[in-house]
From Swiss-Prot:
Comp. bias regions, Low complexity: 17-30
Cofactor field: heme
Keyword terms of this UniProt record: Dioxygenase, Heme, Iron, Metal-binding, Oxidoreductase, Tryptophan catabolism
An MF annotation (GO) of this entry: tryptophan 2,3-dioxygenase activity
Annotated coiled-coil segments of the chain: none
Residues that bind heme: 266
Main EC class the enzyme belongs to: oxidoreductase
Top-rank lineage group of the source organism: Bacteria
Protein name per Swiss-Prot or TrEMBL: Tryptophan 2,3-dioxygenase
Gene: kynA
Length: 308
C-alpha cells in the first residue's frame, strides 16, 4: 500500500479531502452552462416532458393532508392512515387479479400476486410502529377534532375483509350516505370471496365438494365444511400429486397469518394509545378489535393441520 504523500490520491471521498482532478475529467462548468451539460448525464430540464412528480401526481398526494387541530402530531395520524389506504388499494388490486387468475386456472400468476399481498400486509404491520410513537397525551389533544370518523368506516378495508371471506351485511350501513361507494362494497359482498373461488377450483380438480358449498349465499360468512377439509387433507397427504393446490394452500395460510398480525398490531397500538376507551366510530374500541382476532378466514386450512 502506498503511504500518504504528495503523489498519493486522496482517501475516502466522504472524509472531506479533495483529490487532484484527473487530467481526463472535464473542468467544472459554472452557472447555466453546467445545467446544459447535465449532471451525471441526467436530464435536468422537464419543461417539455413528464417529470417524476408529474407521473406520480405528487402535488395532489402531498396536498391531501389537512389537519383540523393545532396539534403537531395530527400530521402523523393523517399520513399513517392515508398511506395505509394506498397499500390497501394495491392489496385489493392484487387480490382481484389473483381471483381472476384462479377462475381461469392460471395458478402461477395467482401465487405471485398472493405473495405480494402478504408482503403488503407485512408493510402495514410495520407501519403501526410509527403510529405507536404517539403518546396518549398527544392523541388526546387531537381526538376532539376527529368527530366520528374512524378506520372502522374504511370502505377499502371493508372490501378487503369481504374479499377474504369475512362477510357481514350490516357493514354496508356505514357507506349508505355514499351511493357510489356503497355500490362497490355491495358488489364485493355479493360476489364469491377469494377462498370461495379456491374451493370451486378444488371441485374442478376432481375433489368431491358438497354442492351446497359450491353454490351458497355469498353474502354470508363462511362456515367449516367437511368436504373442503377432506380435499385439503388429500392435498397435504400427497403434495407431489397436487403440487399447485398444495402451493395455493400455503399461500393462503401465509396470507391469513400476515392478516392476523396486522389485526394484532392494530389492537396493541390502540391499547397503547387510548387504552380501553370507546372508539371514535362508536365501537367498544380495543375489545371490539380483540374480538376480530378470533375471525378465521380459511377454517379448513387451519383445522386440517390437526387432522393430518
Amino acid at each position: 500500500m502506498q503511504p500518504p504523500g504528495d503523489n498519493a490520491p486522496a482517501g475516502c471521498p466522504f472524509s472531506g479531502a479533495h483529490a487532484a482532478q484527473p487530467a481526463h475529467e472535464a473542468p467544472h462548468v459554472p452557472g447555466d452552462a453546467a445545467g446544459e451539460a447535465g449532471w451525471h448525464d441526467a436530464q435536468l430540464d422537464f419543461s417539455k416532458s413528464m417529470s417524476y412528480g408529474d407521473y406520480l401526481s405528487l402535488n395532489s398526494i402531498l396536498d391531501a393532508q389537512h389537519p383540523l387541530s393545532p396539534d403537531h402530531n395530527e400530521m402523523l395520524f393523517i399520513i399513517q392512515h392515508q398511506t395505509s389506504e394506498l397499500w390497501m388499494k394495491l392489496a385489493l388490486f392484487e387480490l382481484r387479479g389473483a381471483l381472476d387468475a384462479v377462475r381461469g386456472d392460471a395458478l402461477p400468476p395467482a401465487f405471485k400476486m398472493l405473495a405480494r399481498v402478504s408482503r403488503i400486509l407485512e408493510q402495514l404491520v410495520q407501519a403501526w410502529n410509527v403510529l405507536s410513537t404517539m403518546t396518549p397525551s398527544e392523541y388526546s389533544a387531537m381526538r376532539p377534532y376527529l368527530g366520528q370518523s374512524s378506520g372502522f368506516q374504511s370502505y377499502q378495508y371493508r372490501q378487503l375483509e369481504f374479499l377474504l371471506g369475512n362477510k357481514n351485511v350490516q357493514m354496508l350501513q356505514p357507506h349508505a350516505h355514499r351511493p357510489d361507494i356503497l355500490e362497490q362494497v355491495r358488489a364485493t359482498l355479493e360476489a364469491p370471496s377469494f377462498y370461495d373461488e379456491v374451493v370451486r377450483l378444488l371441485a374442478r380438480r376432481g375433489f368431491p365438494i358438497a354442492p351446497e358449498r359450491l353454490e351458497r349465499d355469498w353474502t354470508q360468512p363462511m362456515r367449516h365444511d367437511e368436504t373442503v377439509e377432506a380435499a385439503w387433507l388429500e392435498v397435504y397427504r400427497h403434495p407431489q400429486q397436487h403440487w399447485e393446490l398444495y402451493e395455493m394452500a400455503e399461500e393462503l395460510v401465509d396470507l391469513e397469518d400476515a392478516f392476523r398480525q396486522w389485526r394484532f398490531r392494530h389492537v396493541t397500538t390502540v391499547e397503547r394509545i387510548i387504552g380501553f376507551k370507546q372508539g371514535t366510530g362508536g365501537t367498544s374500541g380495543a375489545p371490539y378489535l380483540r374480538k376480530m382476532l378470533d375471525v378465521v378466514l380459511f377454517p379448513e386450512l387451519w383445522h386440517v393441520r390437526t387432522t393430518l
